UniProtKB/Swiss-Prot annotation:
HAMAP family: DGGGP_synth (MF_01286). One of its GO terms (cellular component) is plasma membrane. The chain crosses the membrane at residues 18-38, 47-67, 99-119, 120-140, 163-183, 218-238, 243-263, 269-289. Prenyltransferase that catalyzes the transfer of the geranylgeranyl moiety of geranylgeranyl diphosphate (GGPP) to the C2 hydroxyl of (S)-3-O-geranylgeranylglyceryl phosphate (GGGP). This reaction is the second ether-bond-formation step in the biosynthesis of archaeal membrane lipids. Belongs to the UbiA prenyltransferase family. DGGGP synthase subfamily. Gene3D superfamilies: UbiA prenyltransferase (1.20.120.1780). Its cofactor is Mg(2+). Its EC number is 2.5.1.42. GO terms for biological process: glycerophospholipid biosynthetic process. This is Digeranylgeranylglyceryl phosphate synthase. It comes from the Archaea. It is an enzyme of class 2 (transferase). It is found in: Cell membrane.
Length: 289
């Protein structure tokens, strides 16, 4: 490979990969605490599996980096106009090198995931294939692209829990659903925010297909569903009272984001508020165990 390590790390968007890896490790921690608290009957030792949690972090880091690299490979034309400084359009990484590099990362991540257990491996393989499909096709498909990002981001927590088998997945399934709904809503809002630029680039997004107003209603509906379902982890005895207190702050943030979109027609502010609300939701997940 002709490019240096720093260039390939840039291609991976390593900072985002680090955050995704930490999120997966948090998923492992939350699932462990839920299972060990006696709300389920796990078949594993009481000691926290630090090695497997480290492998979970590594897998998500690699697969996320692969997804970013393959995304840049398919976005060469757009990035040459909008992001000419990126590794591929700037000529620092050849397109073929980026392509092979992404598949190498996908393969490494999936193999490591299968070394943890078959459930981890299956999720890693499915997500890798979905990331490739997203970069090639789904990214330009209205709604399906938004749903894909919602699933992929939410599944990071689910993947972290999967080291405990189906018991771990069951423990975090509601949290995965809430995260996926909130992220899908924000993705739609981001598309509304980017309508002008996407229109100039000839992109086919949900707001451009059905209009900003209808897309906004769908984002509001999805966000409200996340808010309405947010108490479920408490009522299902998955998380404790601290979760309710903190998730209430997140819910206020989501409602503020909805108001900015629906009443004030400000998708930029709405998108920022969604992001802040999701941060509080993550804190609620961690503290609520």
């Amino acid at each position: 490979m002709s490019a240096g390590i720093r260039t390939y790390l840039e291609l991976m968007r390593y900072k985002n990969c680090l955050m995704a890896g930490f999120a997966a490790a948090i998923g492992t921690l939350i699932a462990f605490n839920i299972l060990i608290s006696g709300t389920s009957t796990p078949n594993f030792e009481d000691a926290f599996p630090f090695l497997d949690a480290g492998l979970v972090f590594l897998v998500v880091f690699l697969v996320s980096g692969a997804g970013n690299a393959i995304n840049d490979y398919f976005d060469i034309k757009i990035d040459s106009i909008n992001r000419p400084e990126r590794p591929i359009p700037s000529g620092r990484v050849k397109a073929k090198e980026a392509f092979y590099f992404s598949y190498l990362l996908f393969a490494l991540g999936t193999l490591i995931a299968f070394s943890i257990n078959s459930i981890c491996g299956s999720i890693a393989l499915f997500n890798s294939l979905l990331l490739i499909l997203y970069a090639k096709t789904l990214k330009g498909t209205p709604l399906l692209g938004n749903l894909s990002i919602g699933y992929l981001t939410g599944s990071v927590f689910l993947f972290g829990a999967s080291i405990f088998g189906f018991g771990g997945i069951k423990a975090l399934s509601v949290l995965f659903l809430l995260a996926a709904l909130a992220i899908t809503a924000r993705e739609i809002v981001k598309d509304i925010e980017d309508m002008e630029g996407d229109s100039l680039e000839g992109a086919d997004t949900l707001p451009l297909r059905i209009g900003a107003k209808k897309a906004g209603y769908l984002a509001v509906l999805t966000g409200l569903l996340a808010v309405i379902l947010s108490p479920l982890p408490y009522f299902m005895s998955v998380l404790g009272l601290r979760y309710i207190y903190l998730v209430s702050l997140a819910d206020l943030g989501f409602l503020a984001a909805i108001i900015q979109l629906l009443v004030r027609n400000n998708p930029t502010k709405s998108s920022k508020l969604f992001k802040i609300a999701m941060f509080f939701a993550l804190i609620a997940f961690i503290a609520g165990v």
